Amino acid sequence: MAKDVRFDTDARNRMLKGVNTLADAVKVTLGPKGRNVVIDKSFGAPRITKDGVSVAKEIELEDKFENMGAQMVKEVASRTNDEAGDGTTTATVLAQAIIKEGLKSVAAGMNPMDLKRGIDLAVTKVIAEIQGSAREVADSDEVAQVGTISANGEAEIGRQIADAMQKVGNDGVITVEENKGLETETDVVEGMQFDRGYLSPYFVTNPDKMIAELDDCLILLHEKKLSSLQPMVPLLETVIQSGKPLLIIAEDVEGEALATLVVNKLRGGLKIAAVKAPGFGDRRKAMLQDIAILTGGQVIAEDLGMKLESVTMDMLGTAKRLTISKDETTIVDGAGNKPEIEARVAQIRQQIEESTSDYDREKLQERVAKLAGGVAVIKVGGMSEIEVKERKDRVDDALNATRAAVQEGIVVGGGVALVQGGKSLAGLEGENADQNAGIAIVRRALEAPLRQIAENSGVDGSVVAGKIRESDDNAFGFNAQTEEYGDLFKFGVIDPAKVVRTALQDAASVAGLLITTEAMVADKPAKEGAPAGGGMPDMGGMGGMM
C-alpha cells in the first residue's frame, strides 16, 4: 500500500493538533469541579465518566497523522494508569504542556535532542524533590482523604476505602463490584477464601443458609484424587476418637470415597466435609502449600513419597472455624506458624517482582492477600446503571490512589507538589543554552495541572499559580472545592507521591519522543469509488436468475 510521508514542521503541527484534541477532551475532567465527558456506545446507554484514561481510550481521529499524536498521549494515560492506577488526567495535561512548549522551541531553531536532555535533567531533579517531600500516611483519616480527592470529592467513597483497608490491612485484596441496590457497602471476608464449595449438599450443617460450618476443625490436604477411603481408615478412626470435625481438600473426591463419607456423616459417626482443591496444575500445588502453611499442616504429595496409609494426626492442619457454601470455602484463624507465613508471603512477593505476566502477577497478589490479611469487596450502588458505572470508575481510581499513597507516601495535592518541585530547578544548569531551554519548558509545564484545576473551578489559573509561586510555605495552595487558599494538608487536599511522580515521568518520556520526531509515515487513504477487490464490478447480467 502507498504511504504518505510528512516531514519537519508539517509533521509536528499535524501531530500537535491530535495531541491537543485528545488532551482538551481529557483535561475538562481534572479537579473537584471537573466536568463529565459523555461517551457514545455502539450498544446500550452512553457512558458518563470523569476518568481521564476512559476518555482517552475512546478517542480515534480520522486524520492519520493527527491520530498518531493522539495515540502517543493516550499511551501516557495508559502507562500512568497501569503503574499508579490514577493521575491519568494530570499526566495528559503535563504531556500536552511539555509538547506544546517543546515544539515551539524546535520551530525557533533549537536542537530537539538537547531540549530532550534538558527536559530529562529537570524531571529527574523534580522527582527527587517530590520523593524527598513525601510523608508517610499517618492514619485512616489520611487514607480517606486521598480516596476522597481521587473520587472527585465524594467523602463516602474515601471512607469506604479507608474502612476496607483498615479491616484487611495494606496487603489485603480489595475488589470493586456493582451492587444491585442503591447503597454502596463494604463486605469483608476474614481469613483465606477460595472458590470451591462442598462436593455434596449432604455435608451441610446449617440447612437454613445451606452452608457447612465446622469449628475447631482438622484439615487433610491431598494432592491427588481420592477414589477409595480404604488407605485412610486408620486416620479416620483416630479423628473420630478426637471428636473433632475433618475437612478433606483434594483434587477430587469421587465414587466410593464420597459415598462412604456421606453415609458416615448421615449416621453421625463422623463430622466431615470435602471440597476440591483450588486452582489448576502448578497453581493448585502452590495454593495447597499456602493452605498448609496457613493451617500448620502438610500437603500429602506422592512426589515426596508420602502415602495416605502413613498419614498421622500431626500432619493435619487445624483452623478455629471453617465455612463452606456451595461455591466457596473460608478458613478463619488457621493454626499456622507466623514466621513461616511471613516467609511464604515474602517468597510470593519475590515472584510478583520477577513475573512478566499481568495475569500471573494478579493471581500472586491474591495469594499474598489471602495469606496476609483478607479480602474486602466494595459493592457500588446507584440509581441507574449509568450512575453505578460512573461511580465504579471513581471508586477504582480512589482505591488505586490510596494503595499508591500507602506505598510511597503523600504530598500536597491540587497540583501544588509539582509547582513546589519546580522551585528546585532555580539553580539547575544544562551543558548549553538549548538544554537550559528544556529545563525552562519543564518549569513552565509543571504549573499546567494547577492552572487547569483552577480554570475548571471558574478561577483564573494564572492568578492562582502566581500566588503559590510567591509563597515560601510548601503546603500553601488553592482548595478548588471551597475556592480558598491555605494549608492543603489541613484542608485534606493530598495526593499520593507515586501518582504525581508517575504522571510526570510518563508525560516527559512521551513528550520527549514527540519533540524529537522529524518525519511521519502513514498509509495513504484509499481513493473513493475504487472497486474493493477489482473483480466483478457489474452484476447486472445475473438479473434473470432470481
UniProtKB/Swiss-Prot annotation:
Keyword Translocase recorded: no
Localization, UniProt: Cytoplasm
Listed InterPro entries: Chaperonin_Cpn60_CS, Cpn60/GroEL, Cpn60/GroEL/TCP-1, GroEL-like_apical_dom_sf, GROEL-like_equatorial_sf, TCP-1-like_intermed_sf
Binding site for ATP: 29-32, 50, 86-90, 414, 495
One annotated Gene Ontology cellular component of this protein: cytoplasm
Biased amino acid composition, Gly residues: 531-546
Catalytic reactions on record: ATP + H2O + a folded polypeptide = ADP + phosphate + an unfolded polypeptide
UniProt entry keywords in alphabetical sequence: ATP-binding, Chaperone, Cytoplasm, Isomerase, Nucleotide-binding
Record-level GO BP terms: protein refolding
Principal location class: cytoplasm
Annotated EC: 5.6.1.7
Superkingdom, natural source: Bacteria
GO molecular function: ATP binding; ATP-dependent protein folding chaperone; isomerase activity; unfolded protein binding
Keyword Isomerase: yes
Record region (Disordered): 526-546
Family, per entry: Belongs to the chaperonin (HSP60) family.
Quaternary data: Forms a cylinder of 14 subunits composed of two heptameric rings stacked back-to-back. Interacts with the co-chaperonin GroES.
Name of this protein: Chaperonin GroEL
Gene designation per UniProt: groEL
